[in-house]
């Protein structure tokens, strides 16, 4: 049971790729999977992902509207987008926006898409051209160039296998609360232990409770850090109907869940004999009672086993977040403290991006 989602590995960065595989036996420890994602439409039809390549499978009237949208998009080609909504409308047109992109993404982010800055989703946005969408629909081409179109997943142990393997031969003090980060007489201390430098990977919102007085002179950032927004995730472990999919996206407004992660298909070792499991995701907190009501409406007959709510899973940026974090980094780094990680940097990192950020920090700032 992946309590905060099913994490998979792939990357386009060669340095991350080489570093990662220096610790693992790719053939023996992992399953390589071809991403087979689908979208469960409101009428129960299952459409392959990404939807823009499979419009020909939809109702003829929708196809006709999509063609008109493409003609309009040609007229307005080159017009820049200022937010996520404008990007989606300008890239895919009104029909697909209203049918899939808006309802799905609203369930994920729980806000008007016009209020989502593009910088927040950098590296995660679909970027097909008009030519590609037209050609793929005419020739029924299966696109394999989107994010994580193929990926690696551990044979056993899930994400914990990665952590346990990477932790070998490293001295780690487990089950210890970091309660005090202090600089005194030019020296850094964590829980009284003297350090050369500190790499802060925790949630940035905790930094003031961990630092004694204002020895790092960052109190001016307090209000802005307190106002940083985020989403949590309620992950529901279920037995589901046997299926061939990796992820199933759920734009239907009849229920609150936005996605089923078919973790039972990532590795057969994730399943008990004769059973298929998956994780049904809901944004933010949802009670067990409401979970069960929703499951009755969700396709693939999910049967509740257990669930977990994690308060912090997705950092949310506004147009000023990166500038604020950068200014804070400059201040802290002058004192020997470095921010690193999804919630330390308030960046929507995938696993490989977090690894890349760590490598960049080491190469550019620490190894000097």
Tell me what each language-model feature is.
Residues 1-76:
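Dinucleotide-binding Rossmann-like beta1-alpha1 core, especially the glycine-rich loop
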Residues 15-16, 95, 205-207:
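Glycine-rich nucleotide phosphate-binding loop and flanking beta-alpha elements
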Residues 50-52, 262-368:
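Conserved flavin/dinucleotide-binding core of flavoenzymes
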Residues 46, 186-189, 337:
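Hydrophobic residues embedded in beta-strands of well-ordered beta-sheets
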Residues 57, 208-209, 347:
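Glycine/Thr-rich phosphate-binding loops of Rossmann-like dinucleotide-binding domains
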Residues 62-184, 194, 201:
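Active-site/ligand-binding neighborhood in enzyme catalytic cores
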Residues 176-295, 327, 331:
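Mid-domain catalytic core of redox enzymes
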